[in-house]
């Protein structure tokens, strides 16, 4: 009890994101703190900018969505059979939305890069997070595609998605999180 009195009251920031979507915002906030910004400056920035961090990823195996009830077992089986890869975004409320489907991993990787190309805003001056669920070789391909498109000076931070996210999406998924015009 005595120790809690020595700390100032906290402020909450709803990052409206999970995993890599939250990570990219936190990297920006940490840099602001390192640069000596006050808590009020950081909070004001967050209120304006949090909705300008987008997160998109694809799921490779629909069985995991079937297990969690996001799709029926039949849909998951059929989707896997024909190679459907849903593209998922974290929406303005911080919830996952399926925003499209492609067939095959190659098209899924291209779709992620296309979202960055279409929605990215000043991405070279902000952190860029590339995450995967036990798929470093796929993340390497996306990183190469991004560097070809945006140059080697793109500040890409690589990470593995946490086990909780991985248990819902399964292995072999890749996601991108970046500063965007909108989510």
Enumerate the predicted regions with their spans.
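Mixed-charge interfacial surface used for oligomerization/domain docking
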Residues: 1-11, 17-183
């Amino acid at each position: 009890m005595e120790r809690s009195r020595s700390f100032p009251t906290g402020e909450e920031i709803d990052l409206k994101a999970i995993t890599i979507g939250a990570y990219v915002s936190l990297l920006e906030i940490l840099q602001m703190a390192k640069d000596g910004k006050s808590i009020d400056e950081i909070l004001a920035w967050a209120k304006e900018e949090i909705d300008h961090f987008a997160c998109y990823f694809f799921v490779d195996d629909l069985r995991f969505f079937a297990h969690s009830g996001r799709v029926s077992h039949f849909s998951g089986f059929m989707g896997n059979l024909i190679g459907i890869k849903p593209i998922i975004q974290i929406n303005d409320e911080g919830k996952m939305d399926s925003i499209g489907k492609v067939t095959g991993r190659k098209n899924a990787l291209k779709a992620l890069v296309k979202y960055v190309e279409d929605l990215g805003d000043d991405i070279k001056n902000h952190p860029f997070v590339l995450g995967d669920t036990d798929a470093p070789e796929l993340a390497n391909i996306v990183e190469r595609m991004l560097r070809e498109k945006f140059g080697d000076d793109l500040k890409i931070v690589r990470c593995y998605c946490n086990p909780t996210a991985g248990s819902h999406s399964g292995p072999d998924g890749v996601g991108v999180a970046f500063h965007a015009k909108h989510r």
